[in-house]
């Protein structure tokens, strides 16, 4: 029967028809028969790199150090490479440009406040002179005279701030920072001179009682004066800036270098504080004048209230100026600023590595907020190679942590005291 032969021929036909289907499914695996030797070698080399074969790995150095791994650009950007000591010192210590920029910003704020205050004083002083003349009120005229004194003091302070920004000269090597202190002293002395004049006039009115006052004009002028002096008080108040900022944030809150109240007056401007005391005295006097005007307006027979307010004003101004006088005296006598503790600073310097002792530490203020230090330290023997590092750490501690304006660090190796060879010393000891 031709059945088996026909079946074989049918199967062969089916294979030929299905061959392309099987070829498509297996073509991805049958590449070895068509790839040349050169292409195969290239593929094998690629496979070696991807598989990180040991034959292509870099050789280990003879000294046993680990080979440096080749990293791509992204991994290098993500890495935090260790900095050298010189790089750390450059990163930690502020440069002169940064210090000058901060100082210019601080002076610009002070000048802005004082300029606005001077304009307000000038405008209201003219208004008080007119109102006092119309009301025949000695209290208002005296208040206008007080504002004239305050205006002259602020102008003097602005002049001092302008001169203090000038570069040092051969004669004044520290610059003109102390002019701000001088202007603060002069303004306080002007307040005391005015206080004496007010007390004298008040006593004359108390004794003679031969004056008449227009209560209506006095009341209106005094009310405007209170409003203006309240604005001046908010403008010149520095109570929100008494805390040490970036210079002392690393110190603990109970650090001995801080004032007991937690505030530091070292960052204030003495000129603005003096102007604030003037504004406070003006406010007290304006309130007193307002009370006196109210009494005189409705009870003219009690016009003695005018000199009584002058007495109270004099006592309050004397009390408020005592702190400025004390701070000014400390600066002139080159005392340590009240917000710094010499013993605590010495302890902090002694904690620096390789420091044997702190021989001398002198701290004073050029002006308010500009503390200066000179320190002489001895290092342990054999640490001469670390002098630059120790000096950098000491300067960083004084400038950044304790907020010094300038500092000088002197280093030397520790040496035991040698036997005295001076003839005078030996003769005196015998």
From Swiss-Prot:
Segments for region (Disordered): 245-265
MF GO annotations: antiporter activity; metal ion binding; zinc ion transmembrane transporter activity
Its membrane topology: Multi-pass membrane protein
Catalysed reactions listed for this entry: Zn(2+)(in) + 2 H(+)(out) = Zn(2+)(out) + 2 H(+)(in)
Annotated positions binding Zn(2+): 146, 150, 278, 282
Example GO biological process: zinc export across plasma membrane
Cytoplasmic side: 1-113, 165-178, 238-275, 333-430
Intracellular or extracellular location(s): Endosome membrane; Late endosome membrane; Lysosome membrane
Chain ranges on the Lumenal side, renumbered to this chain: 135-143, 200-216, 297-311
Transmembrane segments: 114-134, 144-164, 179-199, 217-237, 276-296, 312-332
Biased composition (Low complexity): 249-264
PANTHER family recorded: CATION EFFLUX PROTEIN/ ZINC TRANSPORTER (PTHR11562), PROTON-COUPLED ZINC ANTIPORTER SLC30A4-RELATED (PTHR11562:SF27)
Function in brief: Probable proton-coupled zinc ion antiporter mediating zinc import from cytoplasm potentially into the endocytic compartment. Controls zinc deposition in milk.
Family: Belongs to the cation diffusion facilitator (CDF) transporter (TC 2.A.4) family. SLC30A subfamily.
Protein's name according to its UniProt entry: Probable proton-coupled zinc antiporter SLC30A4
Protein's organism: Rattus norvegicus
Record gene name: Slc30a4
